[in-house]
């Protein structure tokens, strides 16, 4: 063990206690992420020239939050604990035992977007473009919660950047939670904010989010310890990497579709023939 490796102290998982109520660090991170998302959504509404109202944004965020919680839990059970679920279906509802999947959360948010768009007669793509820039800060905050809880740590490393997680043995490991915080939280947020500074084709913002997150997650998974009960799967890839591949392909498809639709719009308009001008011809009289 190198003397330069930092030993992460054991931190009480309870951040704040208010009477009989304990607020855990992970829950606090969720709260911070949701609060920031609401603040940013209100800013986007104020700049939308009436296209979005704050009330509409609040409703969308509520549906999105429920999608994250329900989809994240269902995804974790189906993707990572399916044999346990088959043996004990009630495990799905044991949320207090922990276990959330980001990829399941994406499916949950997608369902929420579709539901909201249909209910309010909005474009699914435009709703997706509105909500995805709000997500990276919450993702980053969640990874900080993982780091504080000493969970989802990385693989063993001899790098001086390795950190010793006391519940993971004496060897230093990649702080993969911090890698994800940096890439999926900070860098992804900056990319999306810079991208939406100009008007973009409908669906391209959501596509960029899917593509960038999928790439970042795929890369970080090489440093993250695979789930012990799953290990590495097909082609030596982790479950997280296998689930990220569809996101990457979907993101590229969304972007290609968005820009193709934008490029075709003017040409379609050019193909519309203008109406013929009416002429007042004198009627021929018959005797």
UniProtKB/Swiss-Prot annotation:
User: Record's Gene Ontology CC terms?
Assistant: plasma membrane
State the protein's purpose.
Catalyzes the transfer of the diacylglyceryl group from phosphatidylglycerol to the sulfhydryl group of the N-terminal cysteine of a prolipoprotein, the first step in the formation of mature lipoproteins.
The yes or no answer to whether the keyword Cell inner membrane is present is: yes
UniProt-recorded name of the protein: Phosphatidylglycerol--prolipoprotein diacylglyceryl transferase
Q: In which pathway does it act?
A: Protein modification; lipoprotein biosynthesis (diacylglyceryl transfer)
Task: Tell me yes or no: is Membrane among this UniProt entry's keywords.
Answer: yes
Q: Where is the signal peptide?
A: none
Give the domain of life. Answer: Bacteria
Q: Where is this region: Disordered?
A: 266-287
**Tell me, which GO biological process terms does this entry list?**
lipoprotein biosynthetic process
InterPro entries named among the record's database cross-references? Lgt
What Gene Ontology terms describe what this protein does at the molecular function level? phosphatidylglycerol-prolipoprotein diacylglyceryl transferase activity
Topology in the lipid bilayer is annotated as: Multi-pass membrane protein
Q: Which residues cross the membrane?
A: 21-41, 60-80, 95-115, 124-144, 176-196, 202-222, 235-255
Q: Where in the cell is it found?
A: Cell inner membrane
- Any idea which UniProt keywords this protein has? Cell inner membrane, Cell membrane, Membrane, Transferase, Transmembrane, Transmembrane helix
- The biased composition feature labelled Basic residues covers 275-287
Taxonomy of the source species: Bacteria, Pseudomonadati, Pseudomonadota, Gammaproteobacteria, Alteromonadales
Q: Binding positions for a 1,2-diacyl-sn-glycero-3-phospho-(1'-sn-glycerol)?
A: 143
- Broad enzyme group: transferase
- Into which family does the record put it? Belongs to the Lgt family.
Q: Which Pfam families match?
A: LGT
EC no. given is 2.5.1.145
